[in-house]
Amino acid sequence: MKRQSLETIHLDKIVGGGQALGTLADGRKCFVWGGLPGETVTVRITKKKSHLVEAVVEEVISPSPDRIQPRDPDSYLSTSPWQIMPLEVEQTYKAQLIDDAFALHNVTLPAAIDIYCDNVAYGYRNKVEFSWYSESVVSRAVSQKKSGLVSGPELFSDNNQDIDADSDREESSGDTLDLAFFRRGSKGKIVIDGTSLAHPAINNLARAIRNLLRHKRVAARQLKTLLVRCDQSGSCVWQLYVKDRLPEIITATEAAKLPAQGGEIIYSDPRSPASRITERLALFGNTTLTDAILGIPFRYACEGFFQVNIPVYEKALRDMKEWVSRESSYWQLEHHQKIIRDPRKVAQIFSEVLLAADRPTLDLYAGVGTIGLTIGSGNVTLVEINADAVREMQRNITELDRTDAHAVLAPSEQALDYITGREIVIVDPPRAGLHTDVIATLLQQLPPRIIYLSCNPVTQARDVALLQQNYHIVHHRGYNFFPRTPHIEHLIILDKKP
């Protein structure tokens, strides 16, 4: 049996990844999940490096006054590690992390950080991917428990090396399966019945599929994941990813009885851990969902990209729209009049503002078009690298009869000719931030305004630090798209310097 590595440490602060930070006796930094600043805790080391370690809390010796009981005590570390703090405390930490990110890159934000939240902390997710856990492993653990080898919460713990949720040789084709999440910091799994983050319809459908498969004598080693998605009304679609070609594991009659509008069985190459589509084995019902964003309907596939917290996303879009509209252009004129004394310069800016009100819009990293097609101008170009997303985008453009919208299938860094300096540019990049070629072209062509929505304030701050040579920040705001998690969205409006 592998020996556990336990340490008792004091936690000092929350850091960018969402962990609490402490220091081991040997001076190495310890990044801890499940802890809060000010606490003294015993942690289990999950990863060791020469200059740092990662760990999870095993015991809280001296709790923070902010600590609360997590809604999902067994699985919260896997999905939403900030369930241990009140929502208002979470808001404070998220503002702090944004501030820290920009301070790291010597970027001064012009106002105090405001984090918008609609105060819906649970039940907001419209998409969840579940893993599987074979009942035969649990049966083996139960027999050990009866003999005194395993007890209490250790039943599904990584502490017992004889219980390996990932070991195919421990599984059999028994009658029972369980839904599961991967345990943070290990390869083990945690048996679940659902997650409090999800829309209730998602949990209900996942349990229904689990209950159906329990009678199929199928082992977890034959399955990869279950992806469930719902629209705002609670109508669901599902995709069952399998490692063996099992097209009849769910029949059409059985699928029709599930609480879903449609679903698919998908063979996914077992050589890859990711749930990628290798072959579509069976299709049931209608697997395309439709949701309205700011009153505009969008179609999207179960596996496609779409926002998981639509109400908060819509608030971000409304805020962004103000900076595409004529009203925000006049705000820009008023702002410059206060700082520029030369009347000829003011007249030039006034002329530019009138033109800006009717400028085209360029939406980079556009996804299925939910930004450009809702808040973009009458002339909008949308650039996206994912072919499936572009197909959905083009379908949305056609159904909306948007003859003034143009979809481009390309990486943003290979669509630089669309940055001409005339358009308002909207960017919503992945966590890696803007490609260096995109930044270089923006600095060369100098569009009048850049609207930058980011899911990673650290890379956003890095990019803004480079853009600041020709741009200044006129507005910023944070958004809590993912309550109970460390993830943050942050909006920056950059205007070209006069």
Stretches found by the model and what they are:
Residues 140-157, 161-163, 168-173, 332:
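Intrinsically disordered, low-complexity segments enriched in serine/proline and basic residues
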Residues 58-71, 76-138, 145, 169-220:
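Extended interfacial segments that mediate partner engagement and assembly in macromolecular machines
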